[in-house]
């Protein structure tokens, strides 16, 4: 009997093995017919079966363990006709099949279910916004030019500190805690000094994933958020481009094939080039003179170029480079400029007989900044370095295995004088090595997405294990519960204090060695900044046109490094009896952020509406006292509307209204004469003219007035010859001219406001 059972078990195992062996795999890429660009997030399936997949950002799809036979593979996505191909799958073989989708030329008569809504059922998708150029352009085009940073300001949990020199604070994290990737390359400062524009040209973007909390182990080195930006490959069919000009800026975009495909078995090469230039510092002297007697002293220039070589199988390699410049020149007050440049390559490799997709990148980037003020010593900061990585993605029907390795090396060089006139210098070289593993498993209605990252920081000899987890449960076809969390660490810190309200100077430095040995009575064992995230949420598709998303989150920043504003002594043996809080250049703090974000979206034919409400609480703890950081905004509301008119949908009206409760502010308590003993005891204080010092009140215990602003734009498209159109845009920033307080000059008691009403006009020609 026992022998029979053994034979029976062996036979069953053999049968299962043979059954698995008698299956096939189909994989490939989906492309757009009009320009040869990959089509991301399209639904691909075998007609009449349950086998289905979604294309990734490269247009890649894969389906495995398919019984041999004849099938029709189909691809669908919003705005395109369904593409299909008949295939015959053979056991133990792999079919590579390319699909080409044609754009619809007729007005939508009914609402189509987008692939984005379908992917919500198979991906955790918590605390992440996928942003497309079409969505960016549905907002008012401020300065007659839509921009990613304008869209970022309406993303749930994101707070902008101002129109001039403003930065983005994402669910309690500071800008240095937000990792920005452009085609896999690290960008250290993605936003220009005037807070309406980023360094990215909207027309070259393919997709931007904004992770606001709880992101997976494929991302490391930051403790708050990630912006992963992917650009287009360039038109593979014909030479085309766009030329635009307005009252704020002008730009030129050119793209086209370097080598066209002779047939479907031939490879291609293409390019895309964007040049963007702002002349607001010149036009504002006449058009916006009411905003400032000297005009608005902001100017910038951005250049980005990319060359892509594609094989017939879908494998590709890309080479890219950029140069970004930004300048601010307040006459007789301050001069500020920064520059960023870099280049690199990335590739996607699809081995013919393998189910694995291999991706890799290698890039170098540099960022330097300098601020010269009339009454202060100059400050400067430099960070440059490389990053490289390889990751492997393995598809098992709806399951995925993703693993990889990343190496980053960078140098920081920093010079700064704090409020106590103490000089702070640091020059460091550091290397970070990270490996990660991620496995996504779908079990009926449950999606499990665990991952782990192991990160080594060579300059401080610290090792950081970072487990993370994402979960989703499909309660029904239209209601889903989700959660995510994990541990995070980073080395890079900002070269300015979290307490600074207005600071154009935004530099970087790596984790310093001279941290205090204790915090809040406990010994400090690590030099890294550390955080823990937890996010829970619910998605509800009310109907085909209307859905709601609610997320609650916690970020526990259990160790932060900040510049010490109270540093008045050198950390030498002569000052051994002084506490670390007055002699260390840097201090340790803790932070805690919690909040709830509610998003309602409505999309039906010509109308798009979006309501975002954010409730947030952020605190910092120095060990001696607790305070609210300057970006702590209790309530933030954004209402967005977009409507298309005309038979050809050639008119569009866009509007956005933003309300924010007041930011924390520290008030003055008085003034005193400050004597600078430059020569020590030999200083003749009777001949030394003192400087005016400020006695500050309790840190950030008061609040600025509430902020609100309405922006509107109107667009008209004139269809010219084939593939050519002229678009005219009129926009108004701050329609009702609300005087929103930016900051108060402590010495002169002058109130400096955000941008006033600013109408603009622009036109663009696409060809």
What is the role of each PLM region?
Residues 442, 554-556, 575-664:
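Gram-negative outer-membrane beta-barrel transporters
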Residues 658-690, 703-711, 715-767:
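C-terminal beta-signal and adjacent terminal beta-strands/loops
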Residues 88-91, 110, 119-215, 232:
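Periplasmic N-terminal accessory/gating domains of Gram-negative outer-membrane beta-barrel systems
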Residues 25, 248-279, 290-327, 335-358, ...:
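Transmembrane beta-barrel wall of Gram-negative outer-membrane proteins
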Residues 368, 413, 458, 478-533, ...:
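Surface-exposed extracellular loop regions of Gram-negative outer-membrane beta-barrel proteins
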Residues 95-100, 148-151, 166-168, 195-201, ...:
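N-terminal periplasmic accessory domains that precede
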Residues 385-389, 428-436, 523, 527, ...:
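Outer membrane beta-barrel strand-and-loop segments of large Gram-negative receptors
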Residues 20-110, 114:
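Periplasm-facing N-terminal accessory domains of Gram-negative outer-membrane beta-barrel systems
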């Amino acid at each position: 009997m026992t022998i029979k059972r053994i034979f029976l078990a062996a036979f069953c195992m053999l049968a299962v093995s043979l059954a698995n062996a008698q299956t096939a795999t189909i994989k490939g890429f989906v492309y757009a017919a009009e320009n040869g660009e990959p089509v991301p997030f399209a639904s691909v399936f075998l007609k009449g079966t349950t086998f289905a997949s979604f294309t990734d950002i490269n247009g890649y799809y894969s389906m495995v363990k398919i019984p041999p036979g004849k099938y029709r593979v189909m691809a669908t996505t919003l705005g395109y006709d369904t593409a299909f191909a008949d295939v015959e799958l053979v056991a133990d073989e792999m079919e590579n099949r390319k699909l080409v989708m044609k754009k619809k030329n007729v007005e939508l008569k009914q609402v189509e279910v987008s692939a984005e809504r379908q992917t919500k059922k198979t991906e955790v998708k918590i605390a992440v916004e996928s942003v497309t150029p079409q969505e960016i352009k549905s907002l008012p085009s401020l300065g007659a030019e839509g921009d990613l940073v304008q869209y970022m300001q309406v993303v749930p949990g994101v707070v902008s500190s101002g129109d001039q020199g403003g930065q983005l604070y994402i669910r309690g994290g500071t800008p240095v805690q937000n990792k920005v990737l452009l085609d896999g390359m690290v960008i250290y400062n993605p936003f220009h000094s005037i807070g309406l524009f980023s360094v990215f040209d909207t027309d070259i973007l393919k997709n931007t994933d904004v992770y606001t909390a709880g992101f997976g182990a494929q991302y490391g080195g930051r403790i708050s958020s990630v912006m992963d930006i992917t650009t287009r490959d360039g038109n593979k069919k014909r030479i085309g481009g766009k030329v635009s000009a307005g009252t704020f800026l002008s730009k030129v975009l050119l793209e086209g094939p370097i080598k066209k495909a002779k047939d479907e078995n031939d490879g291609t090469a293409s390019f895309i080039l964007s040049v963007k230039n702002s002349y607001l510092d010149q036009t504002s002297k006449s058009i916006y003179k009411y905003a400032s007697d000297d005009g608005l002293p902001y100017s910038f220039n951005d250049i980005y170029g990319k060359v892509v070589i594609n094989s017939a199988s879908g494998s590709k390699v890309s080479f890219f480079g950029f140069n970004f410049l930004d300048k601010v020149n307040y006459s007789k007050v301050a001069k500020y400029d920064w520059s960023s440049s870099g280049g690199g390559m990335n590739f996607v490799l699809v081995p013919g007989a393998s189910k694995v997709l291999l991706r890799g990148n290698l890039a170098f980037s540099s960022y330097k900044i300098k601020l010269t003020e009339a009454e202060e010593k100059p400050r400067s900061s430099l960070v440059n370095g490389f990053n490289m990585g390889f990751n492997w993605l393995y598809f098992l029907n709806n399951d995925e295995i993703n693993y990889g390795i990343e190496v980053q090396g960078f140098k920081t060089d920093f010079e700064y004088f704090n409020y106590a006139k103490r000089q702070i210098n640091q020059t460091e070289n550091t290397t970070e090595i990270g490996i990660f593993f991620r496995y996504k498993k779908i079990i009926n209605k449950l999606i499990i997405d665990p991952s782990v990252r192991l990160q080594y920081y060579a300059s401080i000899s610290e090792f950081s294990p970072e487990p993370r987890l994402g979960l989703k449960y499909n309660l029904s076809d239209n209601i889903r519960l989700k959660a995510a969390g994990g541990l995070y660490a980073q080395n890079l810190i900002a070269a300015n204090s979290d307490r600074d309200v207005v600071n154009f100077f935004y530099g970087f430095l790596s984790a310093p060695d001279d941290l205090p040995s204790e915090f809040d009575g406990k010994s400090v064992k690590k030099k890294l900044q550390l955080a823990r995230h937890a996010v829970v949420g619910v998605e509800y598709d009310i109907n085909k046109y209307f859905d709601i998303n609610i997320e609650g989150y916690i970020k526990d920043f259990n160790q932060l490094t900040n510049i010490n504003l109270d540093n008045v002594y050198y950390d030498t043996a002569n000052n051994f009896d002084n506490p670390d809080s007055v002699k260390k250049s840097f201090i340790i703090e803790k932070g805690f952020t919690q909040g709830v974000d509610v998003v309602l979206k409505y999309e039906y034919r010509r109308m798009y509406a979006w309501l975002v409400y954010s409730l947030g609480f952020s605190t910092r703890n120095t060990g001696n006292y607790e305070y609210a950081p300057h970006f702590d905004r209790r309530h933030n509301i954004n209402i967005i509307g977009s409507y298309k008119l005309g038979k050809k949908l050639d008119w569009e009206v866009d509007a956005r209204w933003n309300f924010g409760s007041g930011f924390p502010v520290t008030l003055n308590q008085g003034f005193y004469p400050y004597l600078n003993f430059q020569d020590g005891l030999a200083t003749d204080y009777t001949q030394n003219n003192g400087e005016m010092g400020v006695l500050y009140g309790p840190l950030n215990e008061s609040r600025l007035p509430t902020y609100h602003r309405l922006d509107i734009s109107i667009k008209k498209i004139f269809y010219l010859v084939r593939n050519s159109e002229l678009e005219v845009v009129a926009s108004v920033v701050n329609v009702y001219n609300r005087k929103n307080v930016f900051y108060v000059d402590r010495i002169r008691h002058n109130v400096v406001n955000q941008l006033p009403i600013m109408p603009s006009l622009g036109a663009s020609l696409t060809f």
